[in-house]
């Protein structure tokens, strides 16, 4: 079901369970809309209309037949002081799938409509409580996988990204006004000093926007986590290294080549980041069909991974199959690992690779060096600070890139004395793209795609 394509009426009253499904001490049913109090009054034992905003009251819920359903606490939030900007009632009932569903059914029978995914946050956006970037931050807050991602989402929810976009818009609006005046009063022309100032303002703003675009690298890592793939020939110790990184026996370790036939995945936290770790089948020339399929999947996992750990056997040294693998991996995202250094290998060849680590997965020697090397590759310019504004949403990145492209066209146009009518068109387009980020100019299809990702009840 598409969200925005449903008829939307600002005063329509909606309801949904706002807490996760399953058993628990307390569950919350949220009601929001102009008729929230009227709906609650039909089913709650207390004098709903006499309650002040942001007060909680104990009472009972009854169905239309007068049968007792549950003892509850009701929380009243009136008008603009609520999350949605509309009258809101929260019913705090006993947790558990059955009782929670029964209370919701009573609420819906009293006149509320079942909420669509993200509809409460959509109401908050429509009622001016938050802009679109802040609305998206709500979802990112819920889905945050680590402390840094949580901090970035909180910052965006408080308006850090929105304020930066508004600052860009303010500067560009002033430039657009000058260009519009040039169109309206061509006989006045533009002073060369003004032309130079415009060029400088455009360049400075474009560079500031590019910094924000470049923050997407770190933002995406915080938001999505990182996928790391272990590859290598059979019996080089990939499974042992996976177990060492996970600090548990997840993969079967065997001296028999080809034990790992499929991609084995697990998750861990490394320096606060969410990591998906994949152990793959040993890559070699194989005749058996099942092993061939495992090798094909290994190569696919290698291509899709954010980071590759290419494991070599230090005891055996560099073999022909290892050399072939070294030719296939992209070194900018590959750490080459000499494993089994506990066996005192001698005369290891010097490998000219950017990232090289010596360790023993079996004895857990050198793991800290591996952690540090992973950090070095992940954070190209160092980890982000708490104060840094990051974009974590590809939609924001694309809008900024389009806005910058329009500014570049204006700069080129000024340099080549292009008619101001064409320059103003590009300025408007740049502002239009920025407006997409905070929702001042956005299509219904995009809104539908954004809010449909939310859970029901948020």
UniProtKB/Swiss-Prot annotation:
Query: What is a single cellular component term in the Gene Ontology annotation?
Result: cytosol
Q: Which UniProt keywords apply?
A: Cytoplasm, GTP-binding, Hydrolase, Magnesium, Metal-binding, Nucleotide-binding, Potassium, tRNA processing
Q: How is the subunit organization of this protein annotated in UniProt?
A: Homodimer. Heterotetramer of two MnmE and two MnmG subunits.
What's the family? Belongs to the TRAFAC class TrmE-Era-EngA-EngB-Septin-like GTPase superfamily. TrmE GTPase family.
Which cofactor does this sequence's record say it needs?
K(+)
| Chain sites annotated for binding Mg(2+) | 239, 260
Q: What is this protein called?
A: tRNA modification GTPase MnmE
A GO term for molecular function: metal ion binding
The record describes the protein's role as: Exhibits a very high intrinsic GTPase hydrolysis rate. Involved in the addition of a carboxymethylaminomethyl (cmnm) group at the wobble position (U34) of certain tRNAs, forming tRNA-cmnm(5)s(2)U34.
For this protein, the Enzyme Commission number is 3.6.-.-
Record field: transmembrane: none
Q: What class of enzyme is it?
A: hydrolase
Cellular localisation:
Cytoplasm
Residue span, TrmE-type G domain = 225-379
Top-rank lineage group of the source organism: Bacteria
